[in-house]
Amino acid sequence: MNRNTPLTAHPLHGVRHRVWSAQQLRAEGVSAAQAASQCLPGGPWQQLLPGVFLLHPGPPTDQERVHGALLYAGRPPASARRAGPAPAGPEYGEAMVTGLAALALYGFEAAPPVVALHRVDVLVPRTRRLRSTRFVQVVRAAVPPRPQTRLGMPLAPVERALADAVASLTDAPTVRRLLTEAVRAGYCEPAAVVRELSAAKLLGRAHVVDAVEELLAEGRAVAEDRLYEMVRRHGLPEPLWNVDLCLPGGACLGAVDAYWPEQALAVEIGAPAPREGGTADREHLERLGVTVVRVTPGRLREAMAQQAVVVRTAMAAAEDREPAAYVVVLPR
């Protein structure tokens, strides 16, 4: 092989086969010296990253940059590379794309396209001895999350990718747009985003706190829209929306998102864990004969039909109960 001879021993198909690691080339019979000779000025290849080669002379596409970043970050440790040929298994190891690059690959409109990013963030286990280089920014995790796959590439879950993106952003409008889109487009739930931002110690930043307030408001609005959709799509009777339930003397027992007076049935949108003070209100209402069904935003998004069955079943059960105590229903 001379320096102008491209790799043609095996058919090359798709973006993956235009970006190869040194270990993959070695498994195909291409030595380190031969690979280096292909990258001399005027040669057909170029070294994209340490140990990663681009098998054409032009600029890399956005997918080639991401694939190269994953090959660099996912390569085995040096000791394993010296031990022998590439082992069978995932070519990226435990590496996954995170940050703005991951959000762009998920399809976020608020994230710049990968080609416009000056770096690609790649998440790896904390134990990996790996340095950031060129356009690759190494991000570490004590316990890496389970990746999602898009375009054949492992991506950090949206909430983790958001936290890693926000960590490097100081532009408040961009942070707000990213967080809002995550919820509005149904990528993840607000609680999951807040958990990741808290774990990354980002909730002390003023512009992040402001964005989280908008995120929670957006999440609430989206969940309410889904509750309206559930009632109408599944033919449930129209309830009273967004009301306070009070005793005749004026003491308020709690706010609910939907209430069917004839069945004394209330539906409340809530987080998986009841909010502070919510349990006491619910218990008081149930002692008065009011059934309270709690639905989470996630269940409304992922299992709307099942939640409709729960509500319909509660309505049917109301026919066998003693009449509820009189409560006053007030607009919230």
Regions found by a protein language model. Give the residues of each.
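Short gly/ser-rich loop at a beta-strand->alpha-helix junction or flexible surface loop bordering the NTP-binding
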Residues: 1-204, 240, 316-332
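Surface segments flanking catalytic/ligand-binding clefts of nucleic-acid enzymes
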Residues: 2-4, 30, 183-332
